[in-house]
Regions:
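Conserved PLP-enzyme active-site core in the AAT-like
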Residues: 17-18, 72-271
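Conserved N-terminal alpha-helix of the aminotransferase class I/II PLP-enzyme fold
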Residues: 34-83, 87-88, 104-111
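N-terminal "arm"/small-domain region of PLP-dependent enzymes with the aminotransferase-like
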Residues: 1-53, 59-62
Length: 272
């Protein structure tokens, strides 16, 4: 039976702990840089926390489950996640990106990625014909929906059909709706981006970023890159984000209720 997202937010952690960690409700913080082994040639599966850490892996399993992906990777910030994602592309590749994006993403694309030879076309993806901007060297479409800051909404499913037709990756920043209200992978996206600093964390006390995918080839590439670049999220920050996720449902419901009330007030007063 499929689980409701509220159940995933809370009980995935409890079930794993009941088997492996003495029944503790909260997953332990493995604040260790290195790990001992039983003997020569015998490994616990953990060597060095830049490569793998149990607390980080547990958080990644949770986020992958929330987004219905096969793998999620936790980063030190949302921009660290996007920066690593750009390593999928090489000089001469072209990306179509939404005209309204988070300022940090625009800065990365315009001042770092372009310097490295990647080309961009900025398109209002919520209203323009994206297919008209596809070139021979186009490799991906990158959007936010809703966008930051203008809250433009793009039809992910329709855009996914265009991307698949032209063999392009569809990358969706899902920060503003969170997995509680939207699952881009279910609508045809290949990669989901999150700033965990926002709704996933929810307490304004830590930075985090995530990449989620439902493709084995992309997962393998991301795993190689995160081990190589050392951009993984620290154990204590993983604990804080995991704590925040437990209340994701109630927080998102309240945010939605507040937004509806604000909309009613604006319409009632005639303020525009």
């Amino acid at each position: 039976m499929a689980r409701e997202i509220e159940t995933k937010c809370i009980h995935l952690e409890e079930e794993e702990n009941s088997i492996n960690h003495y029944g503790a409700i909260s997953y332990p913080i493995y604040q260790s840089a290195t790990y001992a082994h039983p003997g020569v040639g015998q490994s616990t599966g953990y060597d060095y926390s830049r490569l793998q850490n149990p607390t980080r892996e547990h958080l990644e399993k949770t986020v992958a489950s929330l987004e219905n992906g096969i793998d999620a990777l936790a980063f030190s910030s949302g921009m660290a996640a996007i920066t690593l994602m750009m390593e999928l592309f090489k000089p001469g590749d072209h990306l179509i990106v939404d005209a309204d994006l988070y300022g940090g993403s625009i800065r990365l694309f315009n001042h770092v990625s372009e310097k490295n030879g990647i080309e961009f076309s900025s398109v209002d993806c919520h209203k323009e014909n994206v297919a008209a901007y596809i070139r021979e060297n186009t490799k991906a479409v990158y959007i936010e929906t809703p966008t930051n800051p203008m809250m433009n909404v793009t039809d992910i499913k329709a855009l996914a059909e265009i991307a698949k037709k032209h063999n392009l990756l569809l990358i969706v920043d899902n920060t503003f709706l969170s997995p509680y209200f939207q699952n881009p992978l279910d609508l045809g996206a290949d990669i989901v981006v999150h700033s965990g600093t926002k709704y996933l964390g929810g307490h304004n006390d830590t930075l985090a970023g995530f990449l989620v995918t439902n493709r084995e080839d992309i997962s393998e590439r991301f795993r190689f890159l995160i081990k190589t670049t050392g951009a993984g999220l620290a154990p204590f920050d993983c604990f804080l984000i995991q704590r925040g996720i437990k209340t994701l449902g109630v927080r998102m419901d309240r945010a939605q209720e507040n937004a509806i009330e604000i909309d009613k007030m604006v319409k009632r007063t005639g303020y525009t």
